[in-house]
Amino acid sequence: MAVNTDLPVLSTGLAHLVAHESYPGHHPEHTRKEVGLVRRRQWWEESIFLVGTPQCLLAEGLADLGLEVVMGRRPEAVVASHLAPLGIRYDTEVVAAVSEAGEALGAVRQNAAFRLHEDGADSDTVTGEVARWGLLSPDRAAKAVEFLTHPTWRAYLTCYVEGLPLCRSFVHGDPARFERLLSEQLTPDVLQDQIAADRARSAAPAQPV
């Protein structure tokens, strides 16, 4: 696991970073699919991870969901108990508020991608918009726009913004479904179909006994 240190890693996102990149996020997904799909089933396509594909949408979505799966929607108290002995400042109320707002504000960066690549807005203008509407410091806004203008990664942000709500709706609090994300060859359409079926069942009138 490599951590980008161009900007300081904030304590507010430390637990999410660990869960996303290691366990139960990217690392177990790659290892379980390597063993279950590539070695056992010989589905060689699973040995290749292509950027900007539906595979990435699910990979980033499940990784972003990882902390929530193991600690629930409000993990701050547990995280604080681990960080306090290390002398890392971690205000649970602030982190909870930032987490809620931060997820919603993720759409600001996705809109910034459209501003850059569809509207033709210049980087300086979009950096200012990301700082203002995304509630980011100028340095972090500039880093976000740098990511959005990179030839390889400029569309990748969609994997985070759209992947998390899709995977969360699919898992719906069921660890067995999260295990499916880690282990099976799924597509966004498969998840959408399951979500639609779940909603249809919940909306169906109860049958008389």
State where each predicted segment sits.
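Long, amphipathic alpha-helical stalk/connector segments used for oligomerization, subunit docking
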Residues: 60, 67-147
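Active-site metal-coordination segments of metallo-dependent hydrolases
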Residues: 48-60, 101-102, 151-160
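Short pre-active-site segment immediately N-terminal to the catalytic Zn-binding motif
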Residues: 3-19
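Post-HExxH zinc-binding segment in Zn-dependent metallohydrolases
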Residues: 30-32, 36-37, 42-82
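Flexible loop/turn segments at secondary-structure boundaries
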Residues: 9-10, 24-25, 31-36, 188-189
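C-terminal, non-catalytic "cap/extension" segments appended to globular domains
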Residues: 131-209
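Flexible glycine/proline-enriched surface loops and loop-helix/loop-strand junctions
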Residues: 8, 44-50, 93-94, 108-109
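Catalytic glutamate of the conserved HExxH
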Residues: 17, 21-27, 31, 61
